[in-house]
Each structure stands twice: as C-alpha cells, then as structure tokens.
Amino acid sequence: MTYSSQLLEMRKVEQILDWSQLIFRKEKTMTRVTSAANDEILVVSADSLLTNNITNNKTYKKKILHNKKIIIALLGQIELITSNGIIEFDKVIENIIKQEINPYLVENQIIQTVEKYFSKYYNKNFLQVCLFWRENQHFLLRAFQLNGDYKIMPFLNYAFGYDYKTKDNVIKVMNHYYFDTGEGAGNHLLGFLNTNPLDFSIQTVRNAINNTDFQTVGGDVFTVTLDKHGI
C-alpha cells in the first residue's frame, strides 16, 4: 500500500479502529509513538519495547519524557554504545528538562548535547526527537533528527494544521490533529482528529502492540497528557 493510499483509507474511517492495520508493515524497523489533541488536551502515547539492532536483544524503557510544561518522545537510537560505556540519551535529555522548561532552549540544548556525542562516537544511526508544548492556546509539535551527518534535520514536511511563527513547516499546531509514527518521525501519518485524543492515542499504540506483525513494538502503553495547566 502506498503512502497516499494509506491516507485515503484513513480519511474513510470516522471512529477508532485497528489503526495499526493501516500503518507501515516493515516489522524490523517498526516503532510507535502517537499523539493527538483537541483544544483542551494533548496526549502522547508510546510502547516501551527497545530492540538492539545488532544482537536483537529486547529490553523495556519509557520513550516519553516530560517536565511540567514539555513532553518529549524519542525514536531511533536511544542508547549509544561506546568504548567508554553506554550513553543513554533518554537520561541525558531528562537531565536537560529537569533544569529548563522553555521549549526553544530545551531544543537547543538537546541538539548541542546529543550532537557532541554523535560527532565524537560517529555511527550511521540517529535519534529522532518529537517535542510537544503549549503556547498561546496552541499545542505545538517540533520533530527533528540528530546524527553524525546533520546537525538538525526537521520533519513534518507534509502540511497539516498551520505553521506557527514560521514559514518552513518546522513547528506545527496539533489542535484537532493526530501525529502517528510508523518508521520514525520522518515517515509518519497525520490528519484531522474527530474523536477523543486520549482514547485515540492509547488505542492506536495498544493495537500496534497487539499486532504480531510488528515485532519491534511491545511492552506497556506509556501515556502523558498536557493541558492548559501543564502536565
């Protein structure tokens, strides 16, 4: 099924169905982070399975981090194995958001810190970051990729909602939209949301976990919600 035909099928569905049947079929690269919002609440959900792409060993870890104002979902290479030990990017980023709540400063610190490790211990893999926050009654999303080749590679090149303080599709308004990753943030499904964000987000991830075709999705559903008061 092509990407355009997937989107066409999605538009035909008005209630929560088994969305995982419509989204990306390459089992070995599958991961799942789903976000959805209306005007009152933003919900981000993820599975908790991590699969080592060399040994195929499976471990479990939360892929969503947060402070009182920001939600961050991680995809791709969350851990970097080096001669000096294992660098856990989730712990690196968690330390950043413990000290900073401004999303723009958080983004800059993540880029500077993670790129420092990638440039020192170069490899071909990458870390993708989905950054969510609320500003002026808008729930906002910024998604980008970090690796040894690019300082920053923004995603969200398919227009949805409308741009926020930008002309180049790098920050998106999530109100009444969903954002669902298949093979990472750069290969995603998105569209208009006409149902409850909490139900949609949780059920989408749960369906992917229960789908035996998706061998790298598993564990429990982890969910974080953000409203006008924070998290």
Each language-model region and where it sits:
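Conserved short S/T/G-enriched processing/targeting/catalytic segments and their helical context
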Residues: L7, T29-N125, Y150-G230
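Short hydrophobic alpha-helical segments used for membrane anchoring or interfacial signaling
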Residues: C130-N136, V224-D227
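Structural motif
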Residues: H138-L140
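Acidic, low-complexity central loop/insert segments
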Residues: F144-Q145, F155
